[in-house]
Amino acid sequence: MYSEVTRSIRVTVRPEYLAQQSQPEERRFVWAYHVRIENEGLETVQLRTRHWQVTDAQGRVQEVRGPGVVGEQPVLRPGEAFEYTSGTPLPTPSGFMVGSYGMVTASGEAFEVRIPAFSLDSPHGRSRPN
C-alpha cells in the first residue's frame, strides 16, 4: 500500500494486477487501483477534480484530468472517508501512477491533495520502474 497526507487528508492506494483482463500476447496489461481518502482534519472538504499521470515502462506519460472520481464529488466531514476502485491499462508489463485531487473547504478555499506515486507491476515485467 502507498499512503500520503496533505493538509490532514490521507490518500491510500493499493494497486492490483488483473491477470484475467490482461492480454500480454497483445501487449495489454490491466490494473485496478483501490483508493481510500480520509479526512483526518477539523474542516469539511469536497473533492472536486482529479489529475493523474500514468507512465508506462518506456517512459510514455498519459495525463488524465476530470471532475470528481467515479462520477462523484464526495464531501468528507472530519473523520469521514471515501473509497473507490478504478483501473488503467498499459501497453507495457509495468509502470507507475501519481497525481492529485482538487479539494475545496466548506469556506471555499481550494487546495491540492497529493496522490502518492505507486507502482503498477505484473509478473510479466523484468524491470520495474519503481
UniProtKB/Swiss-Prot annotation:
PROSITE patterns attached to this UniProt entry: APAG
GO biological process: error-free translesion synthesis
Domain ApaG intervals: 3-127
Domain of life: Bacteria
InterPro entries in UniProt: ApaG_domain, ApaG_sf, Uncharacterised_ApaG
PANTHER family: F-BOX ONLY PROTEIN 3 (PTHR14289), POLYMERASE DELTA-INTERACTING PROTEIN 2 (PTHR14289:SF16)
HAMAP family: ApaG
Protein name: Protein ApaG
Biological source species: Rhodospirillum centenum (strain ATCC 51521 / SW)
